[in-house]
């Protein structure tokens, strides 16, 4: 039941949700998208055509083909890339001539986006009152003026880092090895390790957001089975991926340092991984990681 063109059913969601991240779409909408796009036909563009429009490469698309729900995997992978948004997704579906999808799911997408906007407004209203900022490099609230051990309490000289380390408490021994290899050698990098560098007594979510977005040039994610169960690590990772396209120069670097029983997180699968478990490349591991963190 294809529409005759970019009709009214798709115009409203595109105009009102153009800048919202893909995280605004809930599982019900994603499952229905999969029902439309997973089916391979000769008369309508499927998920592979959408993947090409999203600039996925041939080998990436072939890997997605191995999954039971390739459309769902595609959306998970794409939402961490620059330019990914609800509006952009709808524009690509329009370009591919899938007006049937837009007309069928448009109201549900609009509903999800309105819920997302309302939730963001509620969270914003619950934040502490902001003080006037003279410069973008100064913390935006009084609460965040002194959050690390070397911070200026007045916020005039906020402490900065080469990388924020996202990790679980159970992985602290590897983080300590990372400190020895990257800070206490000729690399002289400066890592932000919450248990060592962050002062107690403030909101962990506000601190993480401030450090990842404003204070750290990169973010290293120590992936393990315990990481997959951590709400704090999940928030930090998704926050870093959801930053505006201009902030994606703060490259996310996933590290796998030991064997995992669970599946590697799909949201990180299309980012190059530093694999400490590979004996063939282990001797190059710290050099590669240090150079990645030293990039401008």
UniProtKB/Swiss-Prot annotation:
Residues 110-155 are annotated as: Intermediate domain. GO terms for biological process: defense response to Gram-positive bacterium; defense response to virus; inflammatory response; innate immune response; MyD88-dependent toll-like receptor signaling pathway; positive regulation of canonical NF-kappaB signal transduction; positive regulation of interleukin-1 beta production; positive regulation of NLRP3 inflammasome complex assembly. The modification Phosphoserine is found at residue 244. It is found in: Cytoplasm; Nucleus. The lineage of its organism: Eukaryota, Metazoa, Chordata, Craniata, Vertebrata. Homodimer. Also forms heterodimers with TIRAP. Binds to TLR2, TLR4, IRAK1, IRAK2 and IRAK4 via their respective TIR domains. Interacts with IL18R1. Interacts with BMX, IL1RL1, IKBKE and IRF7. Interacts with LRRFIP1 and LRRFIP2; this interaction positively regulates Toll-like receptor (TLR) signaling in response to agonist. Interacts with FLII. LRRFIP1 and LRRFIP2 compete with FLII for MYD88-binding. Interacts with IRF1. Upon IL1B treatment, forms a complex with PELI1, IRAK1, IRAK4 and TRAF6; this complex recruits MAP3K7/TAK1, TAB1 and TAB2 to mediate NF-kappa-B activation. PROSITE patterns: DEATH_DOMAIN, TIR. One of its GO terms (cellular component) is nucleus. The intermediate domain (ID) is required for the phosphorylation and activation of IRAK. GO terms for molecular function: TIR domain binding; Toll-like receptor binding. This is Myeloid differentiation primary response protein MyD88. Gene3D superfamilies: Death Domain, Fas, Toll/interleukin-1 receptor homology (TIR) domain. InterPro entries: DEATH-like_dom_sf, Death_dom, MyD88_Death, Myelin_different_resp_MyD88, TIR_dom, Toll_tir_struct_dom_sf. Keywords: Cytoplasm, Immunity, Inflammatory response, Innate immunity, Nucleus, Phosphoprotein, Ubl conjugation. It comes from Pan paniscus (Pygmy chimpanzee). Ubiquitinated; undergoes 'Lys-63'-linked polyubiquitination. OTUD4 specifically hydrolyzes 'Lys-63'-linked polyubiquitinated MYD88. Deubiquitinated by USP3 that cleaves 'Lys-63'-linked ubiquitin chains leading to inhibition of MYD88-induced NF-kappa-B signaling. Residues 159-293 form the TIR domain.
């Amino acid at each position: 039941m294809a529409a005759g063109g970019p009709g009214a059913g798709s115009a409203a969601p595109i105009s009102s949700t153009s800048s919202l991240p893909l995280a605004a779409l809930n599982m019900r909408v994603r499952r229905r998208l999969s029902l439309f796009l997973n089916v391979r036909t000769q008369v309508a563009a499927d998920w592979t055509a959408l993947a090409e429009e999203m600039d996925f490469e041939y080998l990436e698309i072939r890997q997605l083909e191995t999954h039971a729900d390739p459309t769902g995997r595609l959306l998970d992978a794409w939402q961490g890339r620059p330019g990914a948004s609800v509006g952009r997704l709808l524009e690509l579906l329009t370009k591919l001539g899938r007006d049937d999808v837009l007309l069928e799911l448009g109201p549900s997408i609009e509903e999800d986006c309105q819920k997302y906007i309302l939730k963001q407004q509620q969270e914003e209203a619950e934040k502490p009152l902001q003080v006037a900022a003279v410069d973008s490099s100064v913390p935006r609230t009084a609460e965040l003026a002194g959050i690390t051990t070397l911070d200026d309490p007045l916020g005039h000289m906020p402490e900065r880092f080469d990388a924020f380390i996202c990790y679980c408490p159970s992985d602290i021994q590897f983080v300590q090895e990372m400190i020895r290899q990257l800070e206490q050698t000729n690399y002289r990098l400066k890592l932000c390790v919450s248990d060592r560098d962050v002062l107690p007594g403030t909101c962990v979510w506000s601190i993480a957001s401030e450090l990842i977005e404003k204070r750290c040039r990169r973010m290293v994610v120590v992936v393990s089975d315990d990481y997959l169960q951590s709400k704090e690590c999940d928030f930090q990772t998704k926050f870093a991926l959801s930053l505006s396209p201009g902030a994606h120069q703060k490259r996310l670097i996933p590290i796998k340092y030991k064997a995992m029983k669970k599946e590697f997180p799909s949201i990180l699968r299309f980012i190059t991984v530093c694999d400490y478990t590979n004996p063939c490349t282990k001797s190059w591991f710290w050099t590669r990681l240090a150079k990645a963190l030293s990039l401008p």
